[in-house]
């Protein structure tokens, strides 16, 4: 499937070395103020060349809106946007077209379909997340305009090095919108999008991996602030279930947790439970160990999510593989231009999928008028 969502639907299309990539967004209400540059700004955060740790593939990723936005507002009709590929070098892959790359979807695609686009992974490439970000930019605008919901992501771990900043070290920090704006500026000016004081140590770790012709992964934390109580449904349409599906749909993602996550298995119930109190006739939580979701439904506290990102599978080391034509063992050495770490570029993609998920559930739950704003 290439479509995500039930009421706010995003269909992505395109391949890494194809002519273009893009998205069609269906279900966005009319009259949402949005400019092409709002979407372009999100694409700029994802595109190659973000930092010294990004692939040297040169792509401007300039957006073209084909429909659905007129005179600075959505019309209520499908929004279609695309980005043309201009910097692809398909010849880099011609020598290994019959030799699947370890860690990539090449072999699985070939075994399932009997055919696959070997040029940069085709549809399984991280470049296809351009469509996710186009859809996510619209969703971000929608939930912020209607409910002042803000979504921010940042690295908390790079390789084996843990950072010193995350939600649970200072939850009060996230109560202020101005703090979130400052955090965004800080992370965007860091090549690893990491606000931790020891980010220089992390940079050295990645540089060392590059020298060894290797790659590294990491952990990203995503915070959704301002989501009202009641978003999501019990059992099979849970908020965390939808978010998990959205995140796991990104190829680099290998793990997902909510709130205290796996750490909660170490805690007593008395430590994990979020106790309640009344303040100015409002029921509040003393803590947010559940991460803003209980019973599949948002509590009104910030939603706290963490995602594990695997090391970039394209590395320059010689690896063992097979030849699909001769059916013999074969060594493979991957050329081309690749990220030694994909973590910082995945952050805007995760933010986008979180926004799409929230927008979809808020429309279905009656928080946002599906017709017009």
Swiss-Prot record:
Domain of life the protein comes from: Archaea
EC number: 4.2.3.5
Gene Ontology CC: one annotated term: cytosol
Any one GO BP annotation for this protein: amino acid biosynthetic process
Major enzyme class: lyase
Claim: Amino-acid biosynthesis is one of the keywords in the record: yes
Catalytic activity of the protein: 5-O-(1-carboxyvinyl)-3-phosphoshikimate = chorismate + phosphate
One annotated GO molecular function: chorismate synthase activity
Cofactor(s) needed by this chain: FMNH2
Keywords carried by this UniProt record: Amino-acid biosynthesis, Aromatic amino acid biosynthesis, FAD, Flavoprotein, FMN, Lyase, NADP
InterPro entries: Chorismate_synth (IPR000453), Chorismate_synth_AroC_sf (IPR035904), Chorismate_synthase_CS (IPR020541)
Cofactor: binding comment: Reduced FMN (FMNH(2)).
Function: This reaction introduces a second double bond into the aromatic ring system.
Stated family: Belongs to the chorismate synthase family.
Protein name: Chorismate synthase
Organism of origin: Methanococcus maripaludis (strain DSM 14266 / JCM 13030 / NBRC 101832 / S2 / LL)
Taxonomic path: Archaea, Methanobacteriati, Methanobacteriota, Methanomada group, Methanococci
Gene from which the chain derives: aroC
């Amino acid at each position: 499937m290439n479509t995500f969502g039930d009421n706010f639907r995003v269909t992505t299309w395109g391949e890494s070395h194809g002519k273009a990539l893009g998205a069609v967004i269906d279900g966005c209400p009319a009259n949402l103020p949005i400019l092409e540059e709002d979407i372009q700004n999100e694409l700029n955060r994802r595109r190659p060349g973000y930092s010294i740790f990004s692939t040297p593939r040169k792509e401007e990723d300039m957006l073209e809106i084909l429909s659905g936005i007129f005179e600075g507002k959505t019309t209520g009709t499908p929004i279609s946007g695309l980005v043309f590929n201009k910097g692809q070098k398909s010849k880099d892959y011609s020598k290994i077209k019959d030799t699947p790359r370890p860690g990539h979807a090449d072999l699985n695609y070939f075994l399932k379909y009997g055919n696959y686009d070997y040029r940069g992974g085709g549809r399984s490439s991280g470049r296809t997340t351009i469509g996710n970000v186009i859809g996510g930019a619209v969703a971000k605008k929608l939930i912020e305009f209607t409910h002042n919901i803000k979504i921010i992501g940042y690295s908390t771990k790079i390789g084996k090095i843990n950072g010193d900043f995350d939600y649970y070290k200072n939850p009060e920090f996230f109560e202020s919108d101005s703090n979130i704006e400052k955090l965004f500026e800080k992370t965007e000016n860091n090549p690893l999008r990491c606000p931790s004081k020891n980010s220089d140590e992390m940079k050295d770790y990645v540089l060392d991996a590059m020298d060894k012709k290797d790659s590294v992964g990491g952990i990203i934390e995503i915070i959704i602030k301002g989501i009202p109580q009641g978003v999501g449904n019990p059992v099979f349409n849970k908020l965390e279930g939808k978010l998990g599906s959205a995140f796991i749909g990104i190829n680099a993602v290998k793990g997902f947790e909510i709130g205290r996550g796996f750490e909660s298995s170490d805690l007593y119930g008395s430590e994990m439970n979020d106790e309640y109190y009344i303040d100015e006739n409002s029921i509040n939580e003393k803590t947010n160990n559940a991460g803003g979701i209980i019973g599949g439904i948002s509590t009104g506290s910030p939603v706290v999510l963490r995602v594990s990102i695997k090391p970039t599978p394209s590395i320059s080391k010689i690896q063992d593989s097979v030849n699909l034509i001769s059916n013999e063992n074969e060594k493979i050495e991957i050329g081309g231009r690749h990220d030694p770490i994909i973590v910082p570029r995945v952050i805007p993609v995760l933010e986008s999928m979180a926004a799409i998920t929230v927008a979809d559930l808020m429309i279905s739950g009656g928080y946002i008028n599906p017709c017009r704003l």
